Amino acid sequence: MPRKKTFVDNQFEGHPLCDVPREFSYNYIRTIVDLVSTMTERHSKVLVARFDLRYPQGYEADGTNQDFSAAMQAVCRDFSQKKYDPQYVARREQQSSCNPHYHVGFALNGNKKRSIPDLRSTLEKHWSEQLQIPLSEVQEKALVYPCNRAPDGSHRSNGRMINRNSLDASEQKEESIRQLSYLGKVDEDDVTDSATRKFFASQFYKDYNRTMTLKRYWAERKADASSGSSIGSI
């Protein structure tokens, strides 16, 4: 049976994606849903937020994804040191501009990280360092855009906290998937070369499996220790 490449709908396996049907990449949406599901299984609270990373007008990038990849490595290294468990999905797009831009969706341990503005500040810092331009330029030109404006210019919220123990947990999760689903759309106007990578995701599958293996290991160690203690007291 051939593997699905794209589909046209406004939902995916019961998860609402948009108001009207549009074309999505099956693999991209699958990854987005799995990211949110995996993180909400791993943490009781998950902070989800979207940002766009852009180049300043007139900047001569080399056309590769090197700037983006290096900046994301620095961001994730920074967040990992603070125990935020940073995971992300990202999409490269390029239309009429000389340079690409990147849509990024983050999912972090919400028990450790709760501030979206602080998340943006960290992204701005590492994006400015990678492009070797002043931080003030990144901030003034909104080169790390918080995705808080609707197409008509009105304000819209960016990001949310998914609280697994909340009565609204299911709704919070669905809204997060819906927001990130923008990264899974098919854009006919994208001029990115077919040989250039357009979709990115952190190793959340690998990290999750490692975390669960360690949890089982320590649970077994604790159970064995408890059993040994009980035997010794008889």
Predicted regions and their residues:
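Signature for HUH/AEP ssDNA processing cores
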Residues: 33-94
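Histidine-centered divalent-metal-coordination microenvironment in nucleic-acid enzymes
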Residues: 88-112
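Catalytic "initiation/cleavage/transfer" segments centered on a nucleophilic residue
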Residues: 1-43, 110, 115-234
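Charged, low-complexity, helix/coiled-coil-prone segments
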Residues: 4-22, 60-76, 104-106
